[in-house]
Amino acid sequence: MAPPAAPGRDRVGREDEDGWETRGDRKARKPLVEKKRRARINESLQELRLLLAGAEVQAKLENAEVLELTVRRVQGVLRGRAREREQLQAEASERFAAGYIQCMHEVHTFVSTCQAIDATVAAELLNHLLESMPLREGSSFQDLLGDALAGPPRAPGRSGWPAGGAPGSPIPSPPGPGDDLCSDLEEAPEAELSQAPAEGPDLVPAALGSLTTAQIARSVWRPW
């Protein structure tokens, strides 16, 4: 009678057999997996041929040529999208600049008609608004506002507007002793406050092109 085999040896033998079976299954499945992979590649290439059929793709092209044409087409689409984004950003920047300039004009009109505001304070306020003008250095947006920023800022009397940018609206005479000084915006004549875009077209940069003051008033960006 043969002695019984050790339990450890039986376990090692079964593991070796399982390992050989696993490796054998992998070798048997490898050709099938490779065949499926090639079929997927060929199917995708055929779909690319159909998608590009209306363009320069001919009836018979090598797979490498199909891939090259696909890469060119994708690159063209990406460049087009980038140009569209840049154009939208430029248009938004122009609208923001036009709105900012119009708001500065309205502030200038108010501080010019309000006798209670000191001339120095008004000049500092307007100069601060000019220095805070939204500019993007190195882009066409800076050229867009170049005409509006021409000349160093100064504080000419009551207006406090830089040289070359004064709207030209006359300063009203001081109110009588019984009048309140700038008690409320509603007490100021609406014509004086609403005529700012019409009196100061030179404040709008010439680089805005064909944009008129009325168009700017309708399309400007406002923070409220």
From Swiss-Prot:
Its main location: nucleus. The keyword Transcription regulation applies. One of its GO terms (molecular function) is sequence-specific double-stranded DNA binding. InterPro entries: bHLH_dom (IPR011598), HES_HEY (IPR050370), HLH_DNA-bd_sf (IPR036638), Orange_dom (IPR003650). It is found in: Nucleus. One of its GO terms (biological process) is nervous system development. A motif (WRPW motif) lies at residues 221-224. Residues 96-129 form the Orange domain. Residues 1-31, 147-205 are annotated as: Disordered. Residues 25-77 form the bHLH domain. Residues 8-25 have a biased composition (Basic and acidic residues). Keywords: Developmental protein, Differentiation, Nucleus, Repressor, Transcription, Transcription regulation. One of its GO terms (cellular component) is transcription regulator complex. Residues 147-161 have a biased composition (Low complexity). Residues 181-190 have a biased composition (Acidic residues). Pfam families: Hairy_orange, HLH. Does not bind DNA itself but suppresses both HES1-mediated N box-dependent transcriptional repression and binding of HES1 to E box sequences. Also suppresses HES1-mediated inhibition of the heterodimer formed by ASCL1/MASH1 and TCF3/E47, allowing ASCL1 and TCF3 to up-regulate transcription in its presence. Promotes cell differentiation. The C-terminal WRPW motif is a transcriptional repression domain necessary for the interaction with Groucho/TLE family members, transcriptional corepressors recruited to specific target DNA by Hairy-related proteins. Transcription repression requires formation of a complex with a corepressor protein of the Groucho/TLE family. Interacts with HES1. This is Transcription cofactor HES-6. It comes from Homo sapiens. The lineage of its organism: Eukaryota, Metazoa, Chordata, Craniata, Vertebrata.
